[in-house]
Amino acid sequence: MSDERRLEVLRAIVRDYVSTREPVGSRALVERHALGVSPATIRNDMAALEESGYIAQPHTSAGRVPTDKGYRLFVDRLSTLKPLTPAERRAIEHLLDEAVDLDDVVDRTVRLLAQITHQVAVVQYPSLRRTTLRHIELVPMAPGRLLVVMIMDTGRVEQRTIELAADAAPDEAVVAELRARLNAVGAGRRMPRLGVELEMLPTYFAPADRPFVDAVNAVIAEALAEETEERIVMAGTANLARSDTDFPRTISPVLEALEEQVVLLRLLSEMALDAEEVRSERGDGISVRIGHENRHAGLAETSIVASGYGGVAADDAVAYLGVLGPTRMDYPTTMASVRAVARYLSRALGG
């Protein structure tokens, strides 16, 4: 028996089941696909696929449906992804080009991804720890108060206010010098790599001005240390309701898992590691978790397709985005959509 032919039979079963939601029988395969073999041979191939755990027979039907293992083989053997149409690409570009700031970009992206995939879309905000500093601005306010503004390459803006004793407020020349030195050592560098340079800055200033420099350094370090920076946005939850027949028991565990941001953040973090392996094997950096590959019990009947975005290289993502839906998913189209949106989002943030 040909392993390649058996794979073609599995591909046909996956495509038909995704398209029709109906278990697939040998007669349907003969009628819909030019497999070039007899119905008896197809039945034998289906029996072998079932014995190997790639397809299964639901209790109520004589047809077969793909298992998580079957979907995994189907995804792993995808050689190409269907590209988006020129009209779809133009629509994505136009939508993101109109965004006015980072929040608007992220909001437009998550809604767009949900719309074109008909799944739940999730977009992680760019992590401050993985972004590059574009510029630091120091803005004197009231006496003894200074606003520190950090602008990242992703468009993210972090602001912190420093309170100083009125008699310890620096003069304009000191503020200007610190601003210049901060940008000289920091602009164009990843935020976590500023540590040594920041520690050296006070040595360039008079002892009387060093408490001020230390205070600025402290708020920059504080911004990096904050755990609250990791957050996500989500859209398209209603799409799950349209797929409720794909969840044999109940959709409630999925909805409950989606309500827990920590679950989704952990999942995206795990998929970031998956993407490193996928990038070396398939070259596209698209990570796919299928069914029970998801460690959270509430997501055991779902699949997640994710990709990194931002950064100057494929392995330099500043955050991740993805979609979640039933395992009965159009994987090639969904993977292509996630890849395309991630690329356009990267360009939009790169400005």
UniProtKB/Swiss-Prot annotation:
Alphabetical list of Pfam families matching this protein: HrcA, HTH_DeoR
SUPFAM superfamilies listed in its UniProt record: GAF domain-like, Winged helix' DNA-binding domain
Gene3D superfamilies, alphabetized: 3.30.450.40, Heat-inducible transcription repressor hrca homolog, domain 3, Winged helix-like DNA-binding domain superfamily/Winged helix DNA-binding domain
GO BP terms in the entry: negative regulation of DNA-templated transcription
GO molecular function, one term: DNA-binding transcription factor activity
The keyword rRNA-binding is annotated on this UniProt entry: no
Record's keyword terms, sorted: Repressor, Stress response, Transcription, Transcription regulation
Function of the molecule: Negative regulator of class I heat shock genes (grpE-dnaK-dnaJ and groELS operons). Prevents heat-shock induction of these operons.
Family of the protein in this entry: Belongs to the HrcA family.
HAMAP family assigned to the protein according to its UniProt record, in alphabetical order: HrcA
Identification of the protein by name: Heat-inducible transcription repressor HrcA
Organism: Beutenbergia cavernae (strain ATCC BAA-8 / DSM 12333 / CCUG 43141 / JCM 11478 / NBRC 16432 / NCIMB 13614 / HKI 0122)
Gene name of the encoded protein: hrcA
